[in-house]
Amino acid sequence: MSKSYECIVVGGGLAGLTSMAYLRKNRISSLLVEKREKLGGLVETFWHQGFAFDAGIRAFENSGIIFPMLKDLGIEFPFVKNEVTIGIGKKSMALEGKNSLIRYEEMLADLFPMERESIGRIMAEIRKVMGYMEVLYGIDNPLFIEKMDPVYLRKTLLPWFMKYQVNIRKASKLQEPIGVYLRRFTENQALIDVIIQHFFEDTPAFFALSYFSLYLDYSYPLGGTGKLPEKMAEYILENKGEIKTGTGVVKVNPENRTVTLDDGEVITYEKLIWAADQRSFYSMIEGGFDEKVQAQKNLVERSCGGDTILTVFLGVEKDETYFQERCGSHRFHTPSLEGLSTVHFPVHVEEAKEKELFRYTEEYLEKTTYEMSCPSLRDRSLAPLGCTGLVVSTLFSYDVVKRMEDLGVYEEFKAFSVKTILRVLEESIFPGFQEKVRFSLCATPLTMEKETHNYQGAITGWAFTNPTMPSEDRFKKIANSVKTPLLDIYQCGQWTFSPSGLPVSILTGKLAADQVKKKKEQR
């Protein structure tokens, strides 16, 4: 006889772990199934030759969600403030508070003196959105406050809720792609590039402009970002939840309420929470589909995954002082004022020749914006004495890398990318550091796809460029995002709501678990 659970959670990223934690908190018998041996998904820390590297997200923005969730579950571990710096060419500035926006404006004006007035108007837009953010994330998300103090409810939550309604309406109007939106204020494409090219393609204006608030909200867990899934898993196991890693789901039968694992085991569920790739989910459903299910399946299959990244992990024989003086612990670095709009992408990439692709890659890596992170500058134990681990990443096309693989030059592409990135960094910010690089590792969009099992290696769910979004994208409707057209099957994670990120993954994980709890109480 097959095993049976009140709820099965498929996917061991933070969304699935959150769902599982709250299911067990509410004493709902549950099993989490994860295809990889390791939990965490895009939140992971790995070690290589004594250096710790964060493989996915580099730091956490609380957004009124992460810390309240941990407090609600009684999970404690130390964090430090994560300071972000922004560098363009030879100039840089640290984001230390709201007044840092003044220095950011001055830096842009020094670089683009003819655009001083336009820059001032753009900064006014950023301040406006920061005002919205202060309201939207100004208090702990009430979803994670189980026992509400009546005084808190009356004096804090209700006034906040009234402001929230007003500000969410204002924010929801800023859905235009950020590049299009900024052209209202300037026609200088180079200026637009340095402001937005580290955002995902066609990121909505509100989401992009809000990042200046989110940067101030970043924290870093001592021990690396992987401490979060590690502590979540400990909580689940301590509360008698079951976790099965290294095992994937290959079939879902909604009619029989069963999942079939890749080892042939069939398990019965009352409720199912899918916290993994949605294309995989709709490809493995067995049985007949009604019109709503077929329509969603068709939409998912014709939609594109969001942007993915190219990452280089470096072990460098330079101490923390060298990197603290030049980049800090977390930096967004644009080496060139010639932005990505000047880089010509092969229109028909599936037909592009090797030489053309390498030329494109070199030019792209010279003009892109890099996110750089030094884990050991927040926690000295994360690198050998006198050394520093450096993570350097940039958005990069999945299609280009796939074409490189098809042409049989994938390994050459990785080596070329590392060589080019090292040269660009040496010339722009780290003089003399190449000879001190002990080792380098390169993770491409194909690596992301293989390791995370996310379609096209996407790191934030669906692309903003999709004509019709397969997920909910209205903040007011986020509670409905976890529902699917299939009876007693819910969803959570980065494919569930757009725009996504770690806080949204955690939030939807909690919402999905709440739906299961609600249905159980109604029986």
Q: What are the residue ranges of the model-derived segments?
A:
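N-terminal glycine-rich phosphate/pyrophosphate-binding loop and immediately adjacent elements
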Residues: 3-138
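A conserved FAD-binding loop/helix module that cradles the flavin
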Residues: 57, 494-516
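Conserved FAD/dinucleotide-binding core of flavoprotein oxidoreductases
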Residues: 110, 279, 283-284, 315-317, ...
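Active-site/ligand-binding neighborhood in enzyme catalytic cores
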Residues: 127-239, 246, 454-463, 468-469
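A glycine-rich dinucleotide-binding beta-alpha-beta segment and adjacent secondary-structure elements
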Residues: 188-201, 367-373, 431-498
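Mid-domain catalytic core of redox enzymes
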Residues: 221, 250-384
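Flavin-binding catalytic cores
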Residues: 358-367, 383, 410-450
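Active-site-proximal substrate-binding core of FAD-dependent oxidoreductases
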Residues: 517-523
